[in-house]
Amino acid sequence: MDCTQVGDISLQYAGDTDAGSRRDHNEDCFATEPRLGLWLVADGVGGHAAGEVASDLVRSTIIERVTAGDSLVDAITLSHDVLVREIEQREVASALGMGSTVVAVKVNGSEYEVAWVGDSRAYLFGGQLQQLTTDHTRVNELLAHGAITPEQAHNHRDRHVLTQCLGVDKNLQITPGRVTGTLKPGEQFLLCSDGLTDELSDTVIAGLLATNKSPKSQVDALIRAALDMGGNDNVSVVVVGDFELSEQDLETTHNRRRSSDASRSRREKFPFKVLALLTALCLLALWLLQ
């Protein structure tokens, strides 16, 4: 488990990804960037390892643009343009269907912004599980119009047909979803690819988050449960939020900060020591010349 201070709030986080039981490669990726207050999961699509390239390019572009000061929505939108250019430069066969979903959260103090494209999800957990994102899928559109029931949606043949996906169609107008809010004490974010939500119900996910008290144990338990249910797809999970630290975690965090403060203090004192030494040498030289 890693800890970071974002504004006036202390966050703990963990992330992991697994190829699953039926795939020979992993097209998912994730990022934990505490210096930016940024965490994300991307799920690549496309054959000939194109999905791996797509998700990695989306990840690196978003990190680069957020670092440069872009908003989260603008960074995601730009990653679509970057991916489209990459596809145009590749051979048709290797770039066929190349694209990626993404879900990301950016935290500034207790305020947060979640943005996404596709069916990778963000949840908020504080005893109860709340889905923050809305899947950009054909099935979700049918649900919204009352054309099918939630029960029909779960096994619908078009449940994985995306209406928004980065890179796949250069003519598609990408409109990332976006929600904002305030993170309350004891609440955590769960970011995941559909490899998790296809295997586990919200009830099961909530139970695993409730019974595991650290982000690392939550991530491990969720991925393990998805694999136990079949692991039919790559699965990626990131958990970040406000956890009550154990005494051991508090001591580790304190030691890291103390070590960092000591290193900074030594760096700050070093120029003065050099200046004092040079001054002493100059005085000695003047005395010898007399």
Residues covered by each model-derived region:
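PP2C/PPM-type serine/threonine phosphatase catalytic domain
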Residues: 1-290
